[in-house]
């Protein structure tokens, strides 16, 4: 997904001090944001001009203490044609030399009232989400009790129907059929729908339904962290499934591993309730409440007691 300066302006609510439509259409190619420190002293070795340049109180204060000549020299070196934009936080006054250099190099100048660290965090979060490499997987992504659950399985096994039942039970649909996943960092996986499929659910025999229109805004979500994967598969006699919940199967997507449960589909089983329980049980484990561990401790105590009575 490509991101332009205009998209960043709209998302983070920045004020455009200088820049027309052409300058705002410039593409941002990296989520890294630079806060020029040594560059202010004239040291430009290893400088990355392709990054957004963010100036806060420290950078601004140093600039204002320079002579006009030195300020003009530093800003002309710092602002390059490949720089997407220069951003000034805290509504600090824009030096004339900065506007002059931006006009010369064709760079937009943006401003925000937000403190520098918070502004940097907001922009990084947005750019990381947009510029991260996507992987498309087949399945249904649901938000169940605030936790992202990816439901997978063979075609026709009932993933979408299960998703619809979960929506009726008060949970939220994120994506159906195609889920675009990306790593926010080394340990966090996020998922979102393809734009053409947003809020839509395909039910065999019924067709495509608009969940937003039928069930309201509370039934959908634009994106979600993916924390648990559930694979639905047909029950076969003799096939071994985890009965205690102490399995450690994982699914790796975009370099991030998440736990995966395999749940057998059988006539008469209410899959939405089973998946709901699986999500709650996983969350309980994350909070330190492990029913499997409790059972094993009770079993050990019982065995020890029986051995003592012999």
Curated annotation (Swiss-Prot):
SUPFAM superfamilies: HprK N-terminal domain-like, PEP carboxykinase-like
Binding annotation for Mg(2+): 160, 202
Underlying gene: hprK
Note: Both phosphorylation and phosphorolysis are carried out by the same active site and suggest a common mechanism for both reactions.
Reaction catalysis annotation: [HPr protein]-L-serine + ATP = [HPr protein]-O-phospho-L-serine + ADP + H(+); [HPr protein]-O-phospho-L-serine + phosphate + H(+) = [HPr protein]-L-serine + diphosphate
GO MF annotations in UniProt: ATP binding; magnesium ion binding; phosphorelay sensor kinase activity; protein serine/threonine kinase activity; protein serine/threonine/tyrosine kinase activity
Record's protein name: HPr kinase/phosphorylase
Region (Important for the catalytic mechanism of both phosphorylation and dephosphorylation): 201-210
Family membership noted in the UniProt record: Belongs to the HPrK/P family.
Organism of origin: Streptococcus equinus (Streptococcus bovis)
Annotated transmembrane regions: none
Gene Ontology biological process: regulation of carbohydrate metabolic process
Induction notes from the record: Constitutively expressed. Transcription of S.bovis hprK is not significantly altered by growth rate or energy source.
Location of the region described as Important for the catalytic mechanism of dephosphorylation in the Swiss-Prot/TrEMBL record: 264-269
Keyword entries, A-Z: ATP-binding, Carbohydrate metabolism, Kinase, Magnesium, Metal-binding, Multifunctional enzyme, Nucleotide-binding, Serine/threonine-protein kinase, Transferase
Activity-pH dependence: Optimum pH is 7.0 for both kinase and phosphorylase reactions. Activity decreases to less than 10% of the maximal activity at pH 5.5.
Keyword Magnesium: yes
Cofactors named for this entry: Mg(2+); Mn(2+)
Domain notes from UniProt: The Walker A ATP-binding motif also binds Pi and PPi.
Quaternary state and interactors: Homohexamer.
Catalytic residue list: 138, 159, 177 (proton acceptor), 243
Activity regulation info: Kinase activity is inhibited by inorganic phosphate (Pi). In contrast to many other bacteria, neither kinase activity nor phosphorylase activity is affected by fructose 1,6-bisphosphate (FBP).
E.C. designation(s): 2.7.11.-, 2.7.4.-
Free-text function comment from the UniProt entry: Catalyzes the ATP- as well as probably the pyrophosphate-dependent phosphorylation of 'Ser-46' in HPr, a phosphocarrier protein of the phosphoenolpyruvate-dependent sugar phosphotransferase system (PTS). HprK/P also catalyzes the pyrophosphate-producing, inorganic phosphate-dependent dephosphorylation (phosphorolysis) of seryl-phosphorylated HPr (P-Ser-HPr).
Annotated positions binding ATP: 153-160
